[in-house]
Amino acid sequence: MNWLEERLPGIGKVAEDIAEHPVPSHTLNIFYCLGGLTLLAFLVQCVTGLFLALYYKPTPEAAFASVQMITNEVRFGATIRSLHHWAANLMILLVFLHMLRVYYTGSFKKPRELNWLAGCFLLVLSLGLAFTGYLLPYEQLSYWASVIGAETAGSLPVVGATMKIMMQGGIKVTAEMLSRFYVLHVMILPLVTIGFLVAHFIMIRVQGISDPM
């Protein structure tokens, strides 16, 4: 730390402020840890997703075979894929529980409305990550689930038809849909999610944790 302090004056104070920042006593229970646990699940997915991306091939001909290879041939591949899968399921559950806690305790009220909106966007992004990731194994279950998702989007008024074509890359499910979902899942949605997470935590730090009801 002294080496860093000599080259980046003030970094020690920043680290100390982060590590020793006091929190209200009423937050010392599991219900106030749901947001942090959600972040942990997201980080697990980021790390395991990087390893999975090393072997996954986003083409209709090779996607399923590459997933099978990861599961059956790559060392610890089945473990990494299972961690990614269960962390994804757990993250969705934790996001809903976290938002229920925030709503029940009234933590979304003034002056924290913007942070509540950021949390709502994070919920949508989490569902988007789950949906786009579901297609990637490109098996029968994931294929038809994606077809249903595209048809559901297509039923929306005004913008539905355009959304459906954008999702599918045409009038029906094609290889374009797999490549688009892959880019969304591994690049666009994670980066947007990280941006909203940074904003979310900055607002928590500035405004503090809300008082109990």
Curated annotation (Swiss-Prot):
Keywords: Cell membrane, Electron transport, Heme, Iron, Membrane, Metal-binding, Photosynthesis, Transmembrane, Transmembrane helix, Transport. GO terms for biological process: photosynthesis; respiratory electron transport chain. It is a multi-pass membrane protein. The keyword Transmembrane applies. One of its GO terms (cellular component) is plasma membrane. One of its GO terms (molecular function) is metal ion binding. Heme b 1 binds at residues 98, 200. Heme b 2 binds at residues 84, 185. It holds the Pfam family Cytochrome_B. The chain crosses the membrane at residues 30-50, 88-108, 114-134, 184-204. Its main location: membrane. Heme 1 (or BH or b566) is high-potential and absorbs at about 566 nm, and heme 2 (or BL or b562) is low-potential and absorbs at about 562 nm. The subunits of the cytochrome bc complex are a Rieske Fe-S protein (PetC), cytochrome b6 (PetB), subunit IV (PetD), and a diheme cytochrome c (PetX). Belongs to the cytochrome b family. PetB subfamily. This is Cytochrome b6. It comes from Heliobacterium mobile (Heliobacillus mobilis).
